[in-house]
Amino acid sequence: MKIIFVRHGHPNYADDCLTPLGRRQARAAAERLKDAKIDRFYSSSCGRAYETACYIAELHGGAAVKKLDFMREISWGIEGTSDHTHPWDLADRRVAEGKDVMDRDWQNDPDYAGHTLLRSYLAVAAAFDRWLDELGYRREGNYYRVTRENRDVLLLASHGGSSSAVLAHAFGLPFGFVCHALRPGFTAITEVSLEGEVGALISPTFLLANDIEHIKSLSDPSDYNN
């Protein structure tokens, strides 16, 4: 099985939809993926992600897009305080301060332990595992047991935070490292493969990460992921 992750296009966050630039980016992503074999289309239930997925599905015969609530954007901040530090800013701050973004025990670090994003991360990770279980991949420790054959290609349009959370979990990587290293741009395409014989214990593999070549002619670089 292969999952094609696509971040939503440039958003109007207030109205949870795409801006004119975001729609151009979504159309560019659709054109980029028009010849890809995609069996099923999914998105988070947020409007900006669903709209992005619909542009892509339109070039695949207008296929239906199924919404997944668990892939909505994660929350962050420390409740009861004015600290609403974005996960990417938090990761960058840790690097600037010389802290280890590869710490395997990151969930117990004070920077994360009291942070709303940790609860969001854990909820998204657990729901993602339940979804994969339905698709034939059962979580065992840090890996996945193949429980049935599945050669489908799935498209999943979502968000920078929720996609980084599930990728960090699936690959057993610290969330802060994925935030700092991957940084998905608008309509960035990341492809992940889960392959193995039925009964095998497997780990996913990256086929492509954060591909935004299709939007580089549309706007200034400052509009790629802000």
Feature locations, PLM:
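Phosphate-coordination/substrate-recognition cap region in phosphate-metabolizing enzymes
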Residues: A30-W106
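Extreme N-terminal starter segment of soluble prokaryotic enzymes
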Residues: M1-I4
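Acidic, low-complexity terminal tails and accessory targeting/binding regions
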Residues: G62, I74-L90, R138, N142-V153, ...
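Short, well-ordered beta-to-alpha junction loops that form the rim of enzyme active sites
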Residues: S45-C46, F70, R148-G161
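Internal catalytic-core helix/loop-beta-alpha segment
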Residues: Q107-Y143
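Extended, charge-rich low-complexity interaction segments
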Residues: V95-Y112, E213-N226
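Short catalytic helix/loop segments, enriched in acidic residues and glycine
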Residues: L18-L33
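Active-site metal-binding loops of divalent metal-dependent hydrolases
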Residues: G9, C46, G160, N210-I212
